[in-house]
Swiss-Prot record:
Name by which UniProt lists this protein: Patatin-04/09
GO BP term, example: defense response
Organism of this sequence: Solanum tuberosum
A family per Pfam: Patatin
GO molecular function, one term: nutrient reservoir activity
Motif DGA/G positions after renumbering to this chain: 215-217
Coarse class of the protein's main subcellular location: other
Organism ancestry: Eukaryota, Viridiplantae, Streptophyta, Embryophyta, Tracheophyta
Record carries keyword Lipid metabolism: yes
Chain positions carrying an annotated carbohydrate: 115, 325
TM ranges: none
Protein purpose: Probable lipolytic acyl hydrolase (LAH), an activity which is thought to be involved in the response of tubers to pathogens.
Localisation: Vacuole
Motif GXGXXG: chain residues: 36-41
Length: 386
């Protein structure tokens, strides 16, 4: 319901936009959005590795990183973790992880993160290893230090409100300048799987703020693309570099949205006759998968409609596998065999057509996006030099 309301607000704002001028490439706002999905984050990690490799090839720069090209990078749950990995600075003020480092991260730490350690009356996993490895990797880095704008969602179960961590909102809400490891654990703390996360922040005036957070998917229903676009819109309105954007116009947005795969068309479907026999526990197990599959589809439908309404459909690319089956549908199967299957899913996805109406493959579309991102970066650098 919340997603539908957000879309309608965006849709009517866009229809009210009267500007018909073509966007200059250097003035476009670039957005990367990464879905949640636990260990299935391996799938978008494969896509990110390919894209970063293309950017390095186009610009002849092996040190090129995704954060150099996107104005906003947003994620929820495992997508929030990927967001942090590619935007958190190291000692040289460069992303501490290249895209090619993400899949090895899952293989090294996934089996320990998803190693049953809970109880029948509590979460499936105690989350201790996850928090420990996040602290080790992200250190004391805070939101304001991110190398580009970020949008990472969580949900506060004490205030019953979404919490969105962004750099651009810190002037108004300095309490949100939390440590990245706290944010990453919070956005990944999926109910049933991990315990909620409690932490406090302190502002410069001495005020203390308390957070009691769970998975960002509760706030964005797994797909943070609408959230990322909202943050990009605010950025466009506030950043002098985008002063030519007077109102919400998707002709001036370039959005890449990465999914973690769904099984909506194949495995784990049910009949009304089967579901009529379910009790509360059985429904609880099935409803999350149903909700995630439906929301992923509907968010893509909403955004596609909006971009098409502005004759800007080439500015939006959704990369999603809709035919997961077997163990690859599970967000917490971190066995080596399943992770290898997820790698294969990502690599195979690159060769698939973007849609049944277009012969263009995801690989070709990402190469096109890489060229646009590269050209835009060069144009903005030239403009800044004058």
């Amino acid at each position: 319901m919340a997603t539908t309301k957000s879309f309608l607000i965006l849709f009517f704002m866009i229809l009210a936009t009267t500007s018909s001028t073509c966007a200059k490439l250097e003035e476009m706002v670039t957005v990367l959005s990464i879905d949640g999905g636990g260990i299935k984050g391996i799938i978008p990690a494969i896509i990110l590795e390919f894209l970063e490799g293309q950017l390095q090839e186009v610009d002849n720069n092996k040190d090129a990183r995704l954060a150099d090209y996107f104005d906003v990078i947003g994620g929820t749950s495992t997508g929030g973790l990927l967001t942090a990995m590619i935007t958190t600075p190291n000692e040289n003020n460069r992303p501490f992880a290249a895209a090619k480092d993400i899949v090895p991260f899952y293989f090294e730490h996934g089996p320990h993160i998803f190693n049953y350690s809970g109880s029948i009356f509590g979460p499936r996993y105690d989350g201790k290893y996850l928090l420990q490895v996040l602290q080790e990797k992200l250190g004391e880095t805070r939101v304001h230090q991110a190398l580009t704008e970020v949008a990472i969602s969580s949900f506060d179960i004490k205030t019953n409100k979404p919490v969105i961590f962004t750099k651009s909102n810190l002037a108004k809400s300095p309490e949100l300048d939390a440590k990245m490891y706290d944010i990453c654990y919070s956005t990944a703390a999926a109910p049933i799987y991990f315990p909620p996360h409690h932490f406090v922040t302190h502002t410069s005036n001495g005020a203390t703020y308390e957070f009691n957070l769970v998975d960002g998917g509760v706030a964005t229903v797994g797909d943070p693309a609408l959230l990322s676009l909202s943050v990009a819109t605010r950025l466009a309105q506030e950043d002098p570099a985008f002063s030519s954007i007077k109102s919400l116009d998707y002709k001036q947005m370039l959005l890449l949205s990465l999914g973690t795969g769904t099984n909506s068309e194949f495995d784990k479907t049910y009949t009304a006759e089967e579901a009529a026999k379910w009790g509360p526990l059985r429904w609880m197990l099935a409803i999350q998968q149903m909700t995630n599959a439906a929301s992923s589809y509907m968010t893509d439908y909403y955004i596609s409609t909006v971009f098409q309404a502005r004759h800007s459909q080439n500015n939006y690319l959704r990369v999603q596998e809709n035919a997961l089956n077997g163990t690859t549908t599970e967000m917490d199967d971190a066995s080596e065999a399943n992770m290898e299957l997820l790698v294969q899913v990502g690599e195979t996805l690159l060769k698939k057509p973007v849609s049944k109406d277009s012969p263009e493959t995801y690989e070709e579309a990402l190469k096109r996006f890489a060229k646009l991102l590269s050209d835009r970066k060069k144009l903005r650098a030239n403009k800044a030099s004058y």
